[in-house]
Amino acid sequence: MAETDERSLRDLLLESADDLEHIVKMIVDTLINRDKSVMLKNGETVTNIIKLFDSKQDSIKTLLKRVPEFQEREQLIRTLEAHVEKRDEVIQQLETNLKSCEVALTRSCFHANQKLKQMKEAELRPVNSEMLIKLAHQISKHNSVSAPLTWQMGDPSRPFPQEHEFRAGHLLNSKVQSTGPQLLPGKNVAQRPLITSPSASSSNGGTAPIRTVGTPLINSAPTGDFSPRTGFGTDEPPPIQQQVLRGATPNEKQWQNPGVSGATSTQSPYNRVSQSPSSSPNVKLKITGLPNRPGGIDQVQDVRDVEQMSSDSSNSSDSSDDEGASKKTGSSNK
């Protein structure tokens, strides 16, 4: 009966315990009230009731033998439930990580699409690198970023790197340098010219100074205290600065020094030597926006001499007038 029944072991044990209790009550009632017992009147005997008690007791023992099997099964169920809870925690953590990865991927895809769009727009509208550097210089000069200390007004070179300097740099020529011969820095590399820019040549036919790899921008370190007016350790300002202090506005032409038999000297701010000049140079200026005057500095000097002569003649005429007036007053007094 217990094997074919689909009920649980707990229900079967409770039912068997109730039946056994009822049988025990019947036996006790039969033994106490033998004359008034209903079971005895119906033909039942105490022996049959005791046999029924024994059979019910055997069924309970059979059910109790199945208890360890059910206990092992229950322990296995609880163990499996604990493992399921752990797996649930792992799954929840994995779900959280997957969601964060999804958000990161979505954000990365969004930024990548924006970058691709910007790259396409940049390809459609290319910009010269030198123009960008000029604009960056215009922006940076308002943020306490100054030009080199050796740069002066009228210098054709710019205080920022130009496009040809970028093309001749190490970043662009890294592959060429890696395939070429290995040169020791500071020895063989310094002897090789790096920049020869035809655009940097002056208007009078001079060539721009050539920079070499491994050589600094300034040939010699300045000595002495720096002064905004005279530079490093100089008693007098350089010739160019003297002309600037006088109010001149030089262009990009080369400065000429008559003391060197008419030869022009091309100077760069990077090769400037902080020395006091022996004589003040004559400067030929060409200011845009003003009419061209015939002649040079000599005619200007002649004009100044004529003005001085006219001023002397006016002074002499004034003195003669004063003498004539004094004579007239003397004669009237007489």
From Swiss-Prot:
Residues 194-206, 251-282 have a biased composition (Polar residues). The gene is mdt-4. Pfam families: Med4. This is Mediator of RNA polymerase II transcription subunit 4. It comes from Caenorhabditis elegans. Keywords: Activator, Coiled coil, Nucleus, Transcription, Transcription regulation. Residues 71-100 form a coiled coil. The keyword Iron does not apply. InterPro entries: Mediator_Med4 (IPR019258). Component of the Mediator complex. Component of the Mediator complex, a coactivator involved in the regulated transcription of nearly all RNA polymerase II-dependent genes. Mediator functions as a bridge to convey information from gene-specific regulatory proteins to the basal RNA polymerase II transcription machinery. Mediator is recruited to promoters by direct interactions with regulatory proteins and serves as a scaffold for the assembly of a functional preinitiation complex with RNA polymerase II and the general transcription factors. GO terms for cellular component: core mediator complex; mediator complex.
